[in-house]
């Protein structure tokens, strides 16, 4: 596809990136076959090919309207199209340029602006998320369903109800408190050469601290010590996907500086239990491509990112007991399957530990969570969740295991079976 970016992005790093992505597209339309929103509406403009045309027109200087913004807003950013594309079109890189560009030229209604600001304000800081959750519980009956279901509730598997064990003065996460069904298999004590940083996160730190606690216990048993890095916090993904790019960069710089200090002190990697955060941090080099002070730093951090399954493949755990509920359905978040490109890896690890992963129809399709998407596009998100839960529960699993905080909260809202993080299941059998 011929493309020449004009206007403010002409002759910029972002403009050159957009042109390269556009030129790789050959209009074949194979992307539409795997696009969740195209499957819902059948509208060409709600599929990747149509959205590519919209962004191309905008970047080449054609008039931009509210309709273009709406169709881009409906994109989940799931990247299923990238996994299916025979030409290797990196659609998300174009979306990350085109969507903020359109947002700068089309003013949103005030209600949308307020909603998007509120989501960013609440979700990027654990203390604010806890405060908002407490206030929300007080007025739960008055809230719309899309918000009511996100509130922490002990009945949803302890969402927001847990607390991370107290940290030591140096930020080390205690590994005490492992499931007490049986003594754990002994492993070598962590050594200084196998220390890794752990992202505490923002929403997850408030709503599901048990995920990181489980990861710390599991990895300690295979000789890897995790330390939550002082100074690191929200990865910036929510801000970025709500087109607050400068805010996202501010959050990312803080993390980069904190993790580089840890790396210089000997940390081997940055372990991230939320696949959405991991995928975004992997894209830090794009975020800082035009920033000479942080471009190399961002590349260094991106190369250090590890999903827990990658660490456990290198340091395999040993089952100490059979699973209490072996029949499981593994939900692979889009950020893990398409973003981190780790399809099938969690299921394979769990199978080696005695679990019985059941087949899941259309595993490439998004559940509808997609970061803030379930709040900004609740109708689409609810339809996609209903389809995903049907697929996940077709073979009667006892539990659904996922790998991302947003997907966990979104699925648990209506799932007929418990939804947990897969690392918790590993914790219980090792």
Per-range role (PLM):
Residues 1-31:
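Generic N-terminal leader/targeting and pre-domain segments
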Residues 1-11, 38-70, 88-117, 420-425:
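Non-heme iron-sulfur electron-transfer modules
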Residues 19-38, 65-89, 364:
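Cysteine-centered iron-sulfur cluster-binding motifs in ferredoxin-type domains/subunits
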Residues 23, 42-46, 239-246:
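Alpha-helix capping and helix-loop boundary segments enriched in small/acidic/polar residues
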Residues 29-33, 43-48, 225-230:
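N-terminal glycine-rich anion-binding loops that anchor highly charged ligand groups
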Residues 60, 80, 84, 243:
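Short His/Asp/Glu-rich catalytic/ion-coordination signatures at enzyme active sites or charged loops
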Residues 91-156, 164-430:
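Iron-sulfur cluster-binding electron-transfer modules in prokaryotic oxidoreductases
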């Amino acid at each position: 596809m011929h493309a020449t970016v004009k206007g403010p992005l002409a002759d910029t790093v972002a403009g050159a990136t957009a042109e390269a992505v556009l030129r790789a597209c050959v209009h074949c339309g194979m992307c539409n076959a795997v696009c969740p929103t195209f499957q819902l509406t059948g509208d060409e403009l709600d599929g990747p090919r149509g959205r590519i045309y919209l962004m191309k027109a905008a970047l080449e200087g054609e008039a931009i309207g509210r309709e273009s913004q709406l169709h881009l807003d409906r994109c989940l950013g799931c990247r299923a199209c990238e996994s299916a594309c025979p030409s290797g079109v990196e659609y998300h890189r174009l979306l990350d340029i085109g969507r903020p560009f359109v947002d700068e030229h089309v003013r949103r209604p005030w209600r949308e602006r307020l909603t998007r600001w509120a989501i960013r304000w609440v979700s990027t800081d654990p203390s604010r998320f806890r405060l908002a959750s407490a206030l929300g519980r007080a007025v739960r009956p008055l809230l719309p369903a899309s918000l009511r279901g996100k509130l922490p509730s002990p009945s949803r598997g302890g969402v927001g109800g847990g607390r991370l064990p107290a940290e030591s003065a140096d930020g080390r996460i205690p590994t005490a408190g492992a499931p007490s069904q049986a003594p754990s298999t002994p492993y070598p004590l962590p050594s200084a050469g196998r220390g890794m940083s752990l992202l505490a996160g923002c929403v997850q730190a408030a709503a599901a601290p048990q995920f990181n606690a489980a990861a710390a216990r599991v990895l300690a048993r295979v000789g890897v010590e995790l330390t939550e890095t002082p100074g690191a916090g929200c990865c910036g993904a929510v801000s970025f996907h709500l087109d607050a790019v400068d805010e996202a960069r501010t959050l990312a710089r803080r993390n980069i500086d904190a993790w580089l200090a840890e790396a210089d002190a000997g940390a081997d990697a940055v372990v991230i239990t939320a696949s959405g955060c991991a995928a975004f941090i992997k894209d830090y080099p794009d975020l800082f491509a035009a920033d000479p002070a942080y471009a190399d730093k961002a590349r260094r951090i991106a190369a250090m990112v590890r999903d827990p399954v990658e660490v456990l493949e290198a340091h395999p755990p040993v089952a100490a007991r059979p699973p209490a509920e072996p029949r499981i359905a593994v939900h692979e978040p889009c950020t893990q399957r398409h973003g981190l490109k780790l399809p099938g890896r969690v299921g394979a690890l769990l199978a080696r530990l005695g679990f019985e992963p059941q087949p899941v129809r259309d595993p490439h399709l998004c559940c509808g969570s997609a970061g803030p998407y379930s709040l900004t596009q609740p109708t689409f998100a609810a339809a996609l969740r209903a389809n995903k839960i049907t697929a996940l529960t077709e073979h009667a699993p006892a539990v659904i295991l996922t790998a991302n905080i947003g997907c966990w909260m979104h699925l648990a809202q209506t799932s007929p079976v418990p939804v947990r993080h897969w690392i918790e299941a590993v914790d219980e059998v090792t």
